[in-house]
Structures are given as C-alpha cells and as structure tokens.
Amino acid sequence: MSKKLISIVDVKDYVGQEVTIGAWVANKSGKGKIAFVQLRDGSAFFQGVAFKPNFIEKYGEESGHEKFDVIKRLNQETSVYVTGIVKEDERSKFGYELDITDLEIIGESHEYPITPKEHGTDFLMDNRHLWLRSRKQMAVMQIRNAIIYATYEFFDQNGFIKFDSPILSENAAEDSTELFETDYFGKPAFLSQSGQLYLEAGAMALGRVFDFGPVFRAEKSKTRRHLTEFWMMDAEYSFLSHEESLDLQEAYVKALIQGVLDRAPQALDILERDVEALKRYITEPFKRVSYDDAITLLQEHEADEDTDYEHLEHGDDFGSPHETWISNYFGVPTFVVNYPASFKAFYMKPVPGNPERVLCADLLAPEGYGEIIGGSMREDNYDTLVAKMDELGMDKSEYDFYLDLRKYGSVPHGGFGIGIERMVTFVAGTKHIREAIPFPRMLHRIRP
C-alpha cells in the first residue's frame, strides 16, 4: 500500500477526491448488493459504503465479486486500508461518507469480545485495553487530551514555568495515612500524593511554577470520584493574594472548558454533553461563598422537600451530598472559602483575625460533580509554621527543606491543585471517574 494516507478527521478537505485511510472496522451492516462499514482511526468515526455493481464495473465480474465479498465478511476490529471517494452526506452525523472503491485487509480480527451488545462494567474493565476502542471511550480520551493541552497553554500564557516534582519522597504533603510506602535502598520512601511542597521551593526560585504528573493516594474508597493513581496539576505562585488566586483558578477552569469546546466538539456530541451548560460556565462568573455561610445555607434548607443530606454544624466537614447541593443551589462552579483549620492541612495560612479558619478554597462543580480544585495560601512565617507543626506533633526534621523556605526571604505565596480525571469527568458529563483515565487504578483494580 503506497498511497498517501489521510486521517478521518481531515476528510472534509478532500470532498470529491479519492483518498486512502488506515482504519479499524468498528461495525458493519447491509444486505444484498450494498455494505455499510463503520470505520475508526483514532481521530473520528466515519461510514464507508460499498456498492457491488460498482466493484464489478471497475474490476470485472470475478474480481469484483471477490472484493465485495471481502467487505461483506469483515469482522469487528479488523484493520484495513480503505480507498474511496469522499462525499458530503447531510444524513451522517460526521457530515461526510466514503464511497468505497477498494479495501485491503491489514490484520484479521476474530471473535472480538466487546460486541455491540450491552456488557457489564466488570467485563468492560477487565477488557479495558479493548474498551478504549469504543466510540464513547475514545471521546472521553479526546476530551482528556484537550484538557491537558489547554493546561500547558494556559500556564505558558500566564507566565508559569513547568517544574517537575519528584515521585519518590520521604515525607507526606498531607495525610500520611494515605501514602503508598516502598523500599528505597533499605529506607522507607513514599509515592507522591502531591508535588506541592517541592513546588513551593520552585515558586521561591522562579516565581510562578506548575507541575503535571501522576500522584498516588492509598484511600480505601469505592466512590465514583476516587482513584488510587491519578494525574494532578499543581500550581504555586509567589506574591499573589488569596483573591487573585481565586481569579486565576476561575480563569484556568474556564480555559479548560473552552479548550474542549474548541478542540473536541465532536467528542462532546458523541457523549451527548449539554454544550450550552458548558458555555454558561464560561460566560457567567463563578460564585464565592464562605464555609460558614455555606453551612448556614445548608441548615436553612435541610427541611426542603428536595434535599437529601445530613445535618451539619459549624466545624463539620462537607460530604458529597452537601457539595452537590451547594453547587446546584448556585448553578455554576462555586468556590467555598475559609474552611476550619481543624480539618485542613498544616501549611495553610489562617484568616487574619480568625485563626480557626484558613485562607483556602475548594471549587465545587455543578451537576453533582463535587470538588475539582483545592487550593490555599501557605503559611509564610517560620515561627508560626513551626508552632503549628509542634501543635500537631509533627517531626520537623522530616520537613527541614520546607522550613528553610521560610528562613531565607519568605514571601506571601499560595497554590492550588486539580485532579485531571475529575475535570475530565465533569466536562465530559460521564458518571464515573474510572472512564476518565486510560487504565484506572482503584481499591480492587490494578490490571490491566
């Protein structure tokens, strides 16, 4: 096969021309003298149509029959080179169709396990390496790719430098009970749960930094929003106020949504995502509400007919039902700010005049998707941070490098982190986070 190949996504530029595409057979149908072949190549799905009389006219009676029979006998996921004339077709969701003139089999496929019928989740997860080939899973991966692309673009445009934090560490950024431990040449080491502590060093050197990579949390959680291995974007910046940080986070999330609308509109269409809702999240300002005001709101509405959450007092942490109600109440992504210090990380800076609250924020996504961003201002005073660590009984020797940052020219600084899979799930409108990463790692799943 020596013809130049094009991608399915580019066929719009070749209307009326004969092209060759390398693809897999997603499905086929037809009867008699016509065959419909659903093709995919990773960029899009596309329908090819083969007419038996056309093959006989072009190749003769015997060869025409043989070539058409090859198409009729194609199995799902057979790989092919398919040649044909690109035609516009208003009936097609893609807008185009291929009038097949030739087809060459590259690799046979027999008894492909994921047939067009319905399959259970466990079966699909056991065959995740194949499930990724399906239309909806491909769409989710395209949305993930668009979000990653938009992340790098946004931080580059806003003066941030990519700063790679280590995966292996001897200390915890947050809850030490959620760490995966491994042996490091006879010493205990832990897989990173956040690059934040190292990013703070980066911010003191470079001003504005971000990292993007896998993190690990040994949470024994079975919810639809938790993975034990996921990809995290952490950003850290010097000389930025709490309000400026919230502005930056809002601009970032809006840039991610816009990036998907621009780069993966067909994926949103495949997933039947409410695009108008996504556009509204871009155009309308995000809401900001204090933790204490949010608790008061929850208390005022807990007797409402449509509420389904437990009573909370000031000082209690939100559960998923509370987060869902808050974001749905406001109808747009909502920042809840200034949580109690009692259940937040040791490094968060207290609210001036109110040491029981810290300068932090969680961004809650509407439609039941919950927290997608967590961020805070960091305690920049050495003595105050040491006192907090002593109060919590922490071993300061494990954080000597972190404390050094407060001894040599400390400045106001803060940061935030976003789990990419949660953002993908929200933008894609899918129900479970396991579909937002190629090979999910969960409490009872470590293969394939």
Curated annotation (Swiss-Prot):
| Name recorded for this polypeptide | Asparagine--tRNA ligase
Query: What reaction gets catalysed by this protein?
Result: tRNA(Asn) + L-asparagine + ATP = L-asparaginyl-tRNA(Asn) + AMP + diphosphate + H(+)
Q: Does the keyword Protein biosynthesis apply?
A: yes
| PROSITE patterns, A to Z | AA_TRNA_LIGASE_II (PS50862)
Q: Does the keyword Ligase apply?
A: yes
User: InterPro entries, alphabetically?
Assistant: Aa-tRNA-synt_II, aa-tRNA-synth_II, aa-tRNA-synth_II/BPL/LPL, Asn-tRNA-ligase, Asp/Asn-tRNA-synth_IIb, NA-bd_OB-fold, NA-bd_OB_tRNA
Question: What does the subunit comment say?
Answer: Homodimer.
Q: Where is the signal peptide?
A: none
An example Gene Ontology molecular-function term: nucleic acid binding
Enzyme Commission identifier(s): 6.1.1.22
Gene Ontology annotations for the cellular component aspect, listed alphabetically? cytoplasm
Q: Which domain of life is it from?
A: Bacteria
- Annotated organism of origin: Streptococcus pyogenes serotype M4 (strain MGAS10750)
Sorted alphabetically, the keyword list is: Aminoacyl-tRNA synthetase, ATP-binding, Cytoplasm, Ligase, Nucleotide-binding, Protein biosynthesis
Where does this protein reside within or beyond the cell?
Cytoplasm
Q: Which family does it belong to?
A: Belongs to the class-II aminoacyl-tRNA synthetase family.
GO BP terms:
asparaginyl-tRNA aminoacylation
Query: Cross-referenced Gene3D superfamilies, in alphabetical order?
Result: Bira Bifunctional Protein, Domain 2, Nucleic acid-binding proteins
